[in-house]
Amino acid sequence: MTDKTYKIAVLPGDGIGPEVMAQAHKVLDAIEKKHAIHFEREEHDVGGIAIDNHGCPLPQSTVTACEESDAVLFGSVGGPKWEHLPPNDQPERGALLPLRKHFQLFCNLRPAQIHSGLEAFSPLRADISGRGFDIVVVRELTGGIYFGQPKGREGEGANEKAYDTEIYHRFEIERIAKIAFESARLRRKKVCSIDKANVLQSSILWREVVEEIAKDYPDVELSHMYIDNATMQLIKDPAQFDVMLCSNIFGDIISDECAMITGSMGMLPSASLNESKFGLYEPAGGSAPDIAGKNIANPVAQILSAALMLRYSLGEEAAAQDIENAVSQALAAGELTADLAGDKPALSTAEMGDKIAQYILNS
């Protein structure tokens, strides 16, 4: 039987991006050996390195490569070297935002969990974190108050005012809700939709549409929660949640709260998808220029981003689970990079990649 072939645009970027991406390559190599899958991978410049080599943070050659691929595996962009540039020309705003817009990536998926053996890194009490924390935040990324019109400032003195507009169309809510329910089917089959339907008209529509979509997923349990209560419940009893479905602004808040509960940004992957399930996959953390090139960065977020790519864009669930299980095995065995090791011996970035790849091959 011939291997299935997928074309992946690999954009390592700046800072720790290239060294953690090298570990994702090792893991994908291991997946190729274990499964009947082949990845055609091409690396392209993005962010600061693209400014240096091409004069802009997102060269057309990189965009074209992404268009011709099944998915994009993204590292990180930015650093002090480019901070003097006008904001729209800096790596972050000049690369990531245009990519999201070009590919109409309306859905952001942010998994967050406390891995076995790492409970001490969570700021939650041990009796709370010990009950488990394993959540996916499904955030609508292109609508809502960040993009709604009108927005602006006018007037002066005591009458000066500023305004933003929260707008959601039915189709925007329908498509994000479907992804939340489909994600829940791959997990524990629970969706909690976050809104403010006791106050906001946009949230009333949100709740109505989510309930309509839920009828197509009778195997998934739907609940609703107001955003203010949700932020409290995440601290009080995070184990109750599985998939949290959020508007843009509420998802922005909730996903960062979930990240802090885990205790390590170096562990958190992220996916941004469009309607055809084409996706951009990246670590939730930044480019960490202060530790770049030192071989000490935690590559787990980049590796888990590759697992999300396999699950959501390529439909290779077994391979995705192999990566996630290998990460869990390494962490449970106390194989940790410097950000987690404390006073124990730490693995280098490259050693961590080697360990996880080996666990995949041994499974």
From Swiss-Prot:
Pfam families, per database record: Iso_dh (PF00180)
The record's free-text note on cofactor binding: Binds 1 Mg(2+) or Mn(2+) ion per subunit.
E.C. code: 1.1.1.85
Cofactor: Mg(2+); Mn(2+)
One biological process term in Gene Ontology: L-leucine biosynthetic process
Keyword Lipoprotein assigned: no
Keywords: Amino-acid biosynthesis, Branched-chain amino acid biosynthesis, Cytoplasm, Leucine biosynthesis, Magnesium, Manganese, Metal-binding, NAD, Oxidoreductase
GO MF annotations in UniProt: 3-isopropylmalate dehydrogenase activity; magnesium ion binding; NAD binding
NCBIfam families, A to Z: leuB
Subunit structure and binding partners: Homodimer.
Family per record: Belongs to the isocitrate and isopropylmalate dehydrogenases family. LeuB type 1 subfamily.
Protein name: 3-isopropylmalate dehydrogenase
Gene: leuB
